[in-house]
Design a protein with these regions (language model features):
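OB-fold/S1-family single-stranded nucleic acid-binding modules
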Residues: 147-179
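OB-fold and OB-like beta-barrel modules that bind single-stranded nucleic acids
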Residues: 89-98, 134-150, 161-164
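OB-fold (S1/OB) nucleic-acid-binding surfaces
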Residues: 101-126
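Long, hydrophobic alpha/beta structural blocks
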Residues: 1-81
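Short cysteine-rich clusters marking metal-coordination/redox-active sites
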Residues: 180-183, 198-201
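Structural detector for short beta-strands of small beta-barrel domains
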Residues: 52-57, 63, 86-106, 169-181
């Protein structure tokens, strides 16, 4: 019934059901007096949605709370690179300065340059945006939001990435052996600093050719999969949504 409820009430309610994993997202994980919680844009939308949810138990009633869930409030302030305190959250804008590396568990780590500081960043497998992180190259300008993980004996301090917004993409240039203009075949290297030669016709070249490789990612915002959203994560459909209701009653 939750899946059906979401299909009817979306986008006035959100993050109720994960269609990709066929998973209900409104129920608590452990023993809890709260049976479920529906996130939405108004009192009317969440109360209406609750009437569509079937339960085997008789519920005592409901309460509606005004909250900052789905607002990304914790990521609105810029982090101070000269004073990155553990457990603080915010955003940074910088350029990729180390090649992304996939480590054990499928998590991806890279660093960005912000001013004169290098900040290590981690994109975790469960977010399902690790492929995006893997496709970053040196020089890409990105806007990241997340929280600072405390350094430990085995791991350095890292920004746990909660969103990745690509601002500018560098050209991905690959240097290759030149192509013979007569034979349309790749030339062979004659040795270190000796240039290239076509072994069919003898044409020579002294420099490699530049080939631009199309980028697999775009200039856009990438959010984690809905299953990895935190309570404050602002989903795509709420990016330009700003509720300004002052009256809060039923």
């Amino acid at each position: 019934s939750v899946k059906k409820m979401q299909s009817i009430t979306f986008p006035e309610t959100y993050n109720s059901f994960d269609n990709e994993n066929d998973r209900v997202l409104i129920t608590p994980h452990g023993p809890d007096p709260v049976f479920y919680g529906i996130r939405g844009e108004s009192v009317k939308s969440v109360v209406l949605a609750s009437t569509m949810v079937d339960t085997d138990e008789k519920l005592d009633g409901y309460m509606v709370f005004k909250s900052n869930q789905g607002t990304a409030d914790h990521l609105k302030n810029e982090l101070q690179v000269n004073d990155l305190k553990p457990y603080t959250s915010g955003f940074l804008v910088g350029k990729v300065c180390s090649k992304p590396v996939t480590e054990q568990g499928g998590h991806v780590f890279f660093s960005i340059q912000v001013g004169d500081r290098k900040i290590r960043c981690g994109v975790y497998k469960q977010t399902k945006i690790t492929k995006i992180a893997q496709d970053l190259i040196l020089g890409d300008k990105i806007h990241l939001g997340g929280g600072i993980r405390k350094a430990s004996k085995n791991y350095e301090r890292v920004l746990n990435v909660e969103f990745l917004d690509v601002i500018k993409l560098e050209k991905n240039i690959l240097l290759t052996n030149p192509t013979c203009k007569t034979c349309n075949k790749k030339m062979k290297s004659k040795g270190n600093r000796q240039g290239f030669e076509c072994f069919r016709c003898g044409n020579k070249s002294f420099s490699k050719s530049s080939l631009e490789i199309p980028r697999k990612i775009q200039r856009k915002l990438y959010l984690p999969a809905i299953s990895a959203h935190r309570h404050l994560t602002r989903p795509y459909q709420r990016l330009k949504k700003r509720n300004k209701f002052e009256i809060f009653d039923t």
